[in-house]
Curated annotation (Swiss-Prot):
It comes from Oryza sativa subsp. japonica. Belongs to the cytochrome P450 family. The chain crosses the membrane at residues 8-28. Pfam families: p450 (PF00067). Keywords: Flavonoid biosynthesis, Heme, Iron, Membrane, Metal-binding, Monooxygenase, NADP, Oxidoreductase, Transmembrane, Transmembrane helix. Catalyzes the 3'-hydroxylation of the flavonoid B-ring to the 3',4'-hydroxylated state. Catalyzes in vitro 3'-hydroxylation of different flavonoids. Catalyzes the conversion of apigenin to luteolin, naringenin to eriodictyol, and kaempferol to quercetin. Possesses specific 5'-hydroxylase activity toward chrysoeriol (a 3'-methoxylated flavone) and is indispensable for tricin formation. Converts chrysoeriol to selgin, a precursor of tricin, suggesting that chrysoeriol, instead of tricetin, is an intermediate in tricin biosynthesis. Its main location: membrane. One of its GO terms (biological process) is flavonoid biosynthetic process. The gene is CYP75B4. Its cofactor is heme. GO terms for cellular component: membrane. This is Flavonoid 3'-monooxygenase CYP75B4. It is a single-pass membrane protein.
């Protein structure tokens, strides 16, 4: 009996051990199987053969993508020809890309714009993330966009604002006219913003008396770069069509690049030869950005040890191109949208003017030192950036490695677009998202502590993360200074056949979110006459 009992116990023990081993193996292989199961790709609409979803984008891509997120969710996948493209359409999804996985999405995909216009990516906008890119960005950050540099360059911005006011005041008092003259406001603002930046960058005003053919050429180049840059080049996404250049985009880019390169070579040669007068109104004589860069090249003060990482004339020209493309029309466009919204909302305009009258008075013009006291006006600027971001879609980034976002698999090499415009109109974040309500940013409002500096992913007009706009601080100060000056110095009337409630607010999208119709207005001086008597 004892032997039989022992045999039974041994048999039970062996059976238990065997079952335990089987269960363990089953669990291990089950988990391994689950681990091997790939995550799904983000959802998205079915595309066309060869072209993918390109034909579905339409003329206003940001609006089309916003509508797609309503159907497929806040993270969608598209095919642009042979390229995988993912679109972030909500603040939480954008935060995963631009904060949690920022390092993985710090480079740009190669495209025809970077290759043919931006010196083959040897710039800050299109350049790949790495030592050269960091060195170039540091140059801009220290010499143009740091707090000290901004304060040093304050006189440029204020002087150009003064000249803009003088021009508008003279137009309003044109002899022989019974009513103020009409002006295309965007053009006036663009002269102001472009000249302020050009004085800081190359030591002279682009638009100035006697500037002549060179100024016209410069402006034409910047405008055409913005236009061509906003075109989706099919050849970037369908390699078989690249050599055909079916849209003629690459041919235009090459021609445009030659024009810009010739112009910059002449400017650099003149500066080196000493025939271009050094600016007498810069921080130190000759210490505009171009002068600093040329000195760096001449003195062999390389920021990196390797021969390939030197800053050369090519990098200088690429940087100057970046500055003018990213820092001129973007700024004037936001100011124009701000003024259009204020004209449409007379009560908000009145409130802004009352604040300015208290802070500044009516016997002088605004200065930058006044800006920190303009609580309501800062809320106005934030609300304009929310509804009318100058770049409604972020410039594309690229996944260096495969990763997981919001439970979906993002393939290596996938291109990322963030729908800045759509996120800022998300009713889950913004009550009454289509209404222009600066009060939402005031103390006691729904978004009191939100800023536009990349910290709040519901409002990222300058982007976020490592690739956030290098010129954020300059752009924000220039927009606020220019718009506040216009509101303080003038009342604004529309042409006789228009009323504020019927003002056309349609968008025209290239690389920028511009107005479909330019804002034409009549400026009426509202300060004491002595305020406009500027030496």
């Amino acid at each position: 009996m004892e032997v039989a009992a022992m045999e039974i116990s041994t048999s039970l023990l062996l059976t238990t051990v065997a079952l335990s081993v089987i269960v363990c193996y089953a669990l291990v292989f089950s988990r391994a199987g689950k681990a091997r199961a790939p995550l799904p790709l983000p959802p998205g609409p079915r595309g066309w053969p060869v072209l993918g979803n390109l034909p579905q984008l339409g003329g206003k891509t940001h609006q089309t993508l916003h509508e797609m997120t309503k159907v497929y969710g806040p993270l969608i996948r598209l095919r642009f020809g042979s390229s995988d493209v993912v679109v972030a359409g909500s603040a939480p999804v954008a935060a995963q890309f631009l904060r949690t996985h920022d390092a993985n999405f710090s480079s740009r995909p190669r495209n025809s714009g970077g290759e043919h216009m931006a010196y083959n990516g040897r710039d800050v906008v299109f350049g790949p993330y790495g030592p050269r890119w960091r060195a170039m960005r540091k140059i801009c950050a220290v010499n143009l966009f740091s707090a000290r540099a901004l304060d040093d360059l304050r006189a440029f911005r204020e002087r150009e604002a003064v000249l803009m006011v003088r021009s508008l005041a003279e137009a309003s008092a044109a002899p022989g006219s019974s009513s103020p003259a009409a002006v295309v406001l965007g053009k006036e603002v663009n002269v102001c913003t472009t000249n302020a930046l050009s004085r800081a960058a190359v030591g002279r005003r682009v638009f100035a008396a006697g500037a002549g053919e060179g100024a016209r050429e410069f402006k034409e180049i910047v405008l055409e770069v913005m236009e061509v840059g906003g075109v989706l080049n099919v050849g970037d996404f369908v390699p078989a069509l690249r050599w055909l250049d079916p849209q003629g985009v690459v041919a235009r880019m090459k021609k445009l690049h030659r024009r810009f390169d010739d112009m910059m070579n002449a400017i650099i040669a003149e500066r080196r030869a000493g025939s271009l007068l050094k600016p007498t109104d810069s921080r130190e004589e000759g210490k505009d950005l171009l002068g600093l860069l040329l000195a760096m090249v001449q003195e062999q003060e390389w920021l990196a040890a390797g021969e390939d990482d030197r800053i050369t004339d090519t990098e200088i020209k690429a940087l100057i191109l970046n500055l003018f493309v990213a820092g001129t029309d973007t700024t004037s466009t936001i100011v124009e949208w701000t003024m259009a919204e204020l004209i449409r909302h007379p009560d908000i305009l009145k409130h802004a003017q009352e604040e300015l009258d208290v802070v500044v008075g009516r016997d002088r013009l605004l200065s930058e030192s006044d800006l920190s006291h303009l609580t309501f006006f800062h809320a106005i600027i934030k609300e304009t950036f929310r509804l009318h971001p100058s770049t409604p879609l972020s410039l594309p980034r690229m996944a260096s490695e495969e990763c997981e976002i919001a439970g979906y698999r993002i393939p290596k090499g996938a291109e990322l677009l963030v729908n800045v415009w759509g996120i800022a109109r998300d009713p889950a974040i913004w009550p009454d998202p289509l209404e222009y309500k600066p009060s939402r940013f005031l103390p006691g409002g729904t978004h009191t502590d939100v800023d536009v500096k990349g910290n709040d992913f519901g409002l990222i007009p300058f982007g976020a993360g490592r690739r956030i706009c290098a010129g954020l601080s300059w752009g924000l100060r220039m927009v606020t200074m220019t718009a506040a000056t216009l509101v303080h110095a003038f009342d604004w009337q529309l042409p006789a056949d228009q009323t504020p409630d019927k003002l056309n607010m349609d968008e025209a999208f290239t690389l920028l979110l511009q107005r479909a119709e330019p804002l034409v207005v009549h400026p009426v001086p509202r300060l004491l006459p002595s305020a406009y008597n500027i030496a």
